[in-house]
C-alpha cells in the first residue's frame, strides 16, 4: 500500500503503459505500480495526491529577501508536491541583478522589486509569465497600484508578492520617543544617537533618504542634488553604527537604536519587542512592491510555476503575511486576515502617511553616478 | 610562558566554544541559550540542502585535490633540475598563482568564463545540445590552480633535498628510469605529496571567496552557510560548524595515530 | 637518452601548462582587457579602449589606504602574538604534548571562517565583552564595527599561518648553541636576541609574507566585523562586481591591487634579503 503512493517517474510510467498494452502485465499490476490504482480508489477526495503525479521534479530554487517567508509554507509545498525549496537570500536588487547577469544563477523563482523589472526585460533576463499556469493569480482582486509594474508593454513578467515601505525603526526606550522624520534620523545620528544608527547597504534607499532629507526627490539623479546627499552621508558616516541591510539582530540586542527599515521587519521586531516602533519619514521616502518572476534560464520552470501558484493561494498568502508582516495587495487574502492586522498602523499606514512616498524608478537602480556615490560613501 | 600559551589557546577556542554551546540551544536564537536540545543536529542532518552542499564540497575538494596533486607532482618532477626559459615561465606561473589574492582569482575566473561561455554556447548548443556554465568544473579548476601550485612548491622542495647519489646508484644498478622513480624517488617524496593533498583538500573544502564567484548554481557548504547566515543565524548553522570541526578533529587525531604507528615500526 | 628525457619533461609539464593557461593566463588577460573597456548601460562590459578606468582609480584611494594600513598592522599583531606561542611550542613543551598542542592550533582552521567570525559578532557586540567590561565600571565600550574588531578577526583568522612557519624555524634551531652561550655566561635575553631571533627570521618572514598576502585580498572579515564601515580593496571589488556591476572599473581596481601587492611584496623580499634570510621562494612555503 505504501509503495503505491510513491510517485512514479514519467519514463517508468510510459514503460509500464507499454508493457500493459502489449499484454505482458495484468491490469492489476499496471494500476498497482503506476499508482493509478490508488489514485482511482481515492479519486475525488484527494486532489493534492493527484498533483504529485504531475512530475515537477524534486527541487525549486527561490531567490528572495531576508525574513520574507514562513518556512512552514515551504514544508507544506514539499508535502504537497514532493519538491524541496532552496531559499537564497539577497540584500538588494543590485545584487540579484549582478548574479543573474553573470549567468547560470540556477534560480527558478526570484523576487524583483517594481523598479528592477524594466531592466530585466531590457536585458532579456526574465521570462514572460504563462498566467494559465498560475490559476491562483486573479488580477481583478489586486490593487492595481501594486500590480501594474509587473506588466510591461502588455506582457506580464511578474505577479505581485507584497508591497511595503522603507521607513524608520526606532527603539523608543533609548530614543525617548517616536522618530518619524529623516531630519531627526540624520541629525540625531550625529548628535544624541551617535554610534547607534544604521543605514542600508545599497544605494537606492540610503542615497534616496539622504535626498529626501534635503527636500529632493527620492529618485533624483541630478548631480547637484546628489552632491548635497553625498555631503550629508559622508558627514554622518563616522557616527553610524553600521552600513548593513541585516539590521534585525543589532536592533534586537540593543546595540543599534535607529535604522532604515522595511515594513515587515518593523512589524516583526515590534511584535517581539513592543519598545521597537516603526514610522514613515514625514518628508517622504520609498514605497515599493515586489513581484514573483522567473528568470529566462530557470532550470525547473514547472516547479517555478507550481511554487508561485502555491504561494499565491489566498490561504497560504495569508499565513505568509501573518509570519512576515508585509501588506498584501490581494483582496481575497486580506479577507482572511484578522481585523487587528488590517488596522495595524505599521502594516497598513493611513493614506496620508503614504502620500509623500515615491516608488523607486528604473533609472535610479542603474544610474552609475549613484552607484559610485555609494562606493565613495562606504570607503570614506 | 605557559600562562601566555593558555591565553592564546583561550583566544582560539572561545568563539568555537560559543558556537558549540549555542548549537545545543532549544530556541531559535543563535546568540543566547534557551534550554538544552539536540534538535538542531537532527534538523541539519535531515536538511537535504545541507547534505547536498556537504556532498558538493566533498566532491569538489576531493577531485580538485586529486587532480592538483597528480598534475602538480608531475610538474614538480619535470621542473627539478631543469633550467632555461620553460623553467622560468613555470616558476613565474607558480609564484603568481600562489600570490594573487583569492578575490582577484575569483573575479577574473568569473568574468573570463562567462565571456568565453557566451562566445562558445551559441555554437555548441545547436551542435551538441550542451551548454557550458559555471559549476563544479569551474570550482575544481579555480581551486586546483592554487593548490596545484602549492603541491609544486612542496614536492619540488622535497626533490631538491634528495640525495642525487641514491638515484645514480639506482641507475648504475641497472634500474629503468621508471623503476628508479618507483623504488627510490617516490617513497622519499611521498610525505610531501600527502601533505600537498591534505592542504589542497582543506583549502578547497573551506574556501568561500573563490567559490562565491565561480560556483554558478552549485552550493558548497561555505556558500550554504553564508546564505543561511544572511537569513538569520540559527543554531542549525552552529550545529553544522560543530559537526564539521568534530569530524576534522577525529580525522586529524586518527592520522596522527596512524603516523605514530608507522613511525614506531622498525624500518626494513 | 637526452631526447627521451626532454620529451618526458614535456609530457609531465603539459597538464600543468594547460591548467595555468586556462585558469590563470586567460582570466588575467581578460581582466587586463576589460580594464581598458567601458561599462555598458545596464552594467557589465562594453568593448572599447579608454584609460578612463585607471584615471578613476583615485576614487578608491580610501580603500587602498585602509588595506595598506590594516594589512601590515594585522600582520604585525599576528606576529607579536604568534611568536611567543611558537617559541613555547618549539622550545619549552615536552615532545609528548607537542603534537597535541600543535594540532590544537590548526583545528579552529577547519571550521568555516564565516562561522567563527560570526561568533565574534556576539563576543564583541553589546552583550559580549563590553557587557563584561561594564561590570568593572567601563561603561559604553564599543568594539563591534570598528577597525579594532576587524583587527581582532584578522589575527584570529590567520594566527595558525603565522605560528607554523615560526615553529618550524625554531624547531630546527640547534639547542647546543644556546647551551654553549649559557656556558659562556651569556644572559638568556642576549642569547635570545643574538641567537634565537636571527635564526628564526626565515620563519618570521615566511609567516608574515603569507599573512600579508592573504590580508591584501581580504574582504570577508571586514564586511562581517566592520559593519560595512571598514572598507578594504576586496570590499570595493565585491561591490563593483556584485552590486554596481561595473566590470571595467572593477578590473582596473583588480589590476591596481595586484600591482600594489607586487610592489610591496617585492620591497619586502628585498628587505628580507638584506636580513640574509635565505631563499625567497622557499619562504613562500
What name fits each language-model region?
Chain C
Residues 116-155, 189, 226-229:
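Membrane-interfacial helix termini and adjacent extracytoplasmic/periplasmic loops
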Amino acid at each position: 500500500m505504501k509503495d503505491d503512493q510513491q510517485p512514479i517517474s514519467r519514463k517508468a510510467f510510459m514503460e509500464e503503459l507499454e508493457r500493459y498494452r502489449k499484454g505482458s502485465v495484468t491490469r492489476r499490476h499496471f494500476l498497482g505500480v503506476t499508482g493509478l490504482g490508488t489514485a482511482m480508489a481515492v479519486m475525488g477526495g484527494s486532489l493534492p495526491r493527484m498533483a504529485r503525479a504531475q512530475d515537477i521534479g524534486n527541487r525549486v530554487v527561490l531567490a528572495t529577501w531576508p525574513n520574507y517567508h514562513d518556512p512552514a509554507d515551504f514544508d507544506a509545498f514539499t508535502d504537497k508536491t514532493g519538491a524541496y525549496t532552496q531559499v537564497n537570500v539577497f540584500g538588494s536588487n543590485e545584487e540579484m541583478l549582478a548574479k543573474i547577469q553573470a549567468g547560470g544563477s540556477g534560480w527558478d523563482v526570484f523576487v524583483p522589486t517594481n523598479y528592477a523589472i524594466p531592466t530585466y526585460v531590457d536585458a532579456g533576463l526574465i521570462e514572460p509569465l504563462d498566467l494559465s499556469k498560475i490559476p491562483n493569480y486573479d488580477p481583478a482582486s489586486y490593487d492595481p497600484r501594486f500590480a501594474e509594474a509587473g506588466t510591461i508593454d502588455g506582457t506580464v513578467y511578474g505577479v505581485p508578492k507584497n508591497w511595503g515601505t522603507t521607513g524608520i525603526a526606532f527603539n523608543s526606550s533609548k530614543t525617548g520617543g517616536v522618530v518619524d522624520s529623516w531630519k531627526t534620523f540624520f541629525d540625531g545620528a550625529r548628535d544624541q544617537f551617535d554610534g547607534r544608527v544604521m543605514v542600508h547597504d545599497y544605494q537606492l534607499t540610503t542615497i534616496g533618504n539622504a535626498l529626501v532629507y534635503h527636500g529632493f526627490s527620492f529618485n533624483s539623479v541630478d548631480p547637484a542634488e546628489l552632491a548635497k546627499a553625498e555631503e550629508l552621508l559622508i558627514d554622518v558616516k563616522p557616527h553610524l553604527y553600521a552600513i548593513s541591510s541585516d539590521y534585525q539582530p543589532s536592533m534586537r540586542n540593543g546595540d543599534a537604536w535607529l535604522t532604515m527599515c522595511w515594513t515587515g521587519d518593523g512589524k516583526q521586531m515590534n511584535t517581539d519587542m513592543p519598545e521597537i516602533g516603526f514610522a514613515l519619514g514625514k518628508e517622504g521616502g520609498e514605497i515599493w512592491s515586489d513581484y514573483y518572476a522567473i528568470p529566462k534560464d530557470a532550470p525547473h520552470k514547472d516547479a517555478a510555476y507550481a511554487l508561485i501558484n502555491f504561494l499565491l493561494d489566498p490561504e497560504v498568502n495569508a499565513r505568509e503575511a501573518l509570519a512576515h508582516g508585509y501588506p498584501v495587495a490581494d483582496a481575497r487574502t486580506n479577507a482572511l486576515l484578522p481585523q487587528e492586522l488590517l488596522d495595524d498602523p505599521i502594516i497598513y499606514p493611513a493614506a496620508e502617511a503614504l502620500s509623500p512616498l515615491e516608488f523607486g524608478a528604473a533609472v535610479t537602480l542603474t544610474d552609475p553616478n549613484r552607484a559610485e556615490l555609494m562606493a565613495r560613501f562606504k570607503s570614506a | 610562558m605557559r600562562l601566555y600559551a593558555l591565553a592564546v589557546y583561550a583566544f582560539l577556542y572561545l568563539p568555537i566554544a560559543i558556537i558549540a554551546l549555542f548549537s545545543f540551544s532549544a530556541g531559535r536564537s543563535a546568540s543566547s541559550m534557551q534550554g538544552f536540545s539536540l534538535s538542531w543536529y537532527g534538523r541539519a542532518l535531515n536538511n537535504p540542502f545541507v547534505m547536498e552542499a556537504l556532498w558538493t564540497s566533498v566532491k569538489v575538494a576531493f577531485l580538485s585535490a586529486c587532480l592538483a596533486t597528480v598534475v602538480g607532482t608531475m610538474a614538480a618532477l619535470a621542473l627539478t633540475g631543469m633550467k632555461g626559459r620553460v623553467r622560468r615561465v613555470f616558476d613565474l606561473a607558480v609564484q603568481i598563482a600562489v600570490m594573487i589574492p583569492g578575490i582577484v582569482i575569483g573575479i577574473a575566473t568569473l568574468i573570463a568564463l562567462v565571456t568565453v561561455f557566451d562566445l562558445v554556447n551559441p555554437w555548441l548548443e545547436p551542435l551538441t545540445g550542451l551548454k557550458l556554465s559555471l559549476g563544479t568544473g569551474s570550482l575544481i579548476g579555480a581551486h586546483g590552480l592554487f593548490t596545484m601550485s602549492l603541491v609544486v612548491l612542496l614536492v619540488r622542495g622535497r626533490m631538491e633535498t634528495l640525495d642525487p647519489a641514491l638515484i645514480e646508484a639506482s641507475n648504475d644498478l641497472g634500474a629503468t628510469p621508471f623503476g628508479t622513480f618507483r623504488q627510490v624517488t617516490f617513497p622519499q617524496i611521498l610525505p610531501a605529496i600527502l601533505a600537498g593533498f591534505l592542504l589542497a583538500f582543506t583549502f578547497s573544502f573551506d574556501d568561500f571567496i573563490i567559490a562565491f564567484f565561480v560556483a554558478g548554481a552549485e552550493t558548497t557548504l561555505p556558500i550554504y552557510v553564508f546564505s543561511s547566515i544572511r537569513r538569520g543565524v540559527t543554531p542549525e548553522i552552529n550545529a553544522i560548524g560543530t559537526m564539521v570541526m568534530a569530524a576534522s578533529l577525529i580525522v586529524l587525531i586518527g592520522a596522527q595515530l596512524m603516523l605514530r604507528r608507522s613511525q614506531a615500526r622498525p624500518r626494513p | 637518452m637526452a631526447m627521451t628525457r626532454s620529451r618526458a619533461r614535456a609530457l609531465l609539464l603539459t597538464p600543468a601548462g594547460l591548467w595555468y593557461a586556462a585558469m590563470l593566463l586567460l582570466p588575467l588577460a581578460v581582466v587586463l582587457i576589460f580594464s581598458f573597456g567601458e561599462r555598458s548601460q545596464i552594467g557589465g562590459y562594453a568593448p572599447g579602449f579608454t584609460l578612463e578606468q585607471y584615471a578613476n582609480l583615485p576614487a578608491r584611494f580610501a580603500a587602498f589606504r585602509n588595506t595598506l594600513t590594516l594589512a601590515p598592522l594585522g600582520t604585525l599583531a599576528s606576529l607579536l602574538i604568534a611568536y611567543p606561542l611558537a617559541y613555547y611550542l618549539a622550545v619549552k613543551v615536552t615532545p609528548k604534548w607537542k603534537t597535541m598542542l600543535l594540532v590544537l592550533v590548526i583545528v579552529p582552521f577547519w571550521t568555516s571562517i564565516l562561522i567563527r567570525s560570526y561568533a565574534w559578532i556576539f563576543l564583541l557586540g553589546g552583550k559580549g565583552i563590553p557587557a563584561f567590561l561594564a561590570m568593572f565600571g567601563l561603561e559604553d565600550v564599543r568594539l563591534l564595527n570598528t577597525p579594532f574588531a576587524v583587527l581582532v578577526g584578522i589575527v584570529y583568522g590567520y594566527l595558525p599561518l603565522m605560528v607554523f612557519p615560526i615553529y618550524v624555524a625554531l624547531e630546527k634551531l640547534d639547542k647546543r648553541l644556546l647551551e654553549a652561550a649559557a656556558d659562556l655566561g651569556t644572559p638568556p635575553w642576549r642569547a635570545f636576541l643574538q641567537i634565537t631571533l636571527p635564526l628564526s627570521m626565515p620563519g618570521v618572514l615566511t609567516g608574515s609574507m603569507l599573512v600579508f598576502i592573504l590580508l591584501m585580498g581580504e574582504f570577508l572579515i571586514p564586511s562581517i566585523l566592520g559593519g560595512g564601515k571598514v572598507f578594504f580593496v576586496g570590499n570595493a571589488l565585491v561591490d563593483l562586481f556584485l552590486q554596481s556591476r561595473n566590470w571595467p572599473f572593477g578590473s582596473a581596481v583588480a589590476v591596481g591591487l595586484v600591482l600594489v601587492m607586487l610592489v610591496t611584496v617585492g620591497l619586502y623580499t628585498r628587505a628580507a634579503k638584506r636580513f640574509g634570510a635565505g631563499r625567497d621562494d622557499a619562504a613562500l612555503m
